[in-house]
Amino acid sequence: MKTLAYLILCLAPLAMAGGQTDGPAPGKVTLVYFWAEWCAPCKMVTPALQEMASSDADIALRKIDLTNATEESYGVKALPTVKVYNRGGSLVGTVVGADVGKVKSYVAQAKSGG
């Protein structure tokens, strides 16, 4: 629960400013995806993440565009970064880079209660 509160506090300014996210979706496995327009690996991974979320009602995708922000302000060191949260809002894992297989592995772990 501590992780969920931290994430909400970090993302609250985005939500208040009409940003792309409102934090983890209650009762769903949530992918918080940090990306930027200029990021070539992001362009490769975006369609796969969108497909995962659109084909599975248990998965919510929250995209955070860092095109005009710094990665450090969100604790992100490189793009793309995907943070996978379980249904309870606890962080299951973080994937740095365009490794969709690793994201799917964390999603499976999150669905099984991890």
Regions found by a protein language model. Give the residues of each.
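Structural micro-motif
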Residues: 74-83
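Solvent-exposed loop/turn segments at secondary-structure junctions
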Residues: 36-40, 66-70, 90, 99-102
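Local sequence-structure signature of Cys/Sec-based thiol-disulfide redox active-site neighborhoods
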Residues: 21-52
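A short beta-strand-turn-helix
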Residues: 16-29, 68, 72-73
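Bacterial N-terminal signal peptides
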Residues: 5-14
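Thiol-based oxidoreductase modules, predominantly thioredoxin-like and allied folds used
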Residues: 33-34, 46, 50, 56-69
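Non-catalytic, surface beta->alpha helical segment in thiol-disulfide oxidoreductase systems
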Residues: 83-114
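Sec-exported extracytoplasmic/periplasmic mature domains
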Residues: 44, 50, 54-58, 87-90, ...
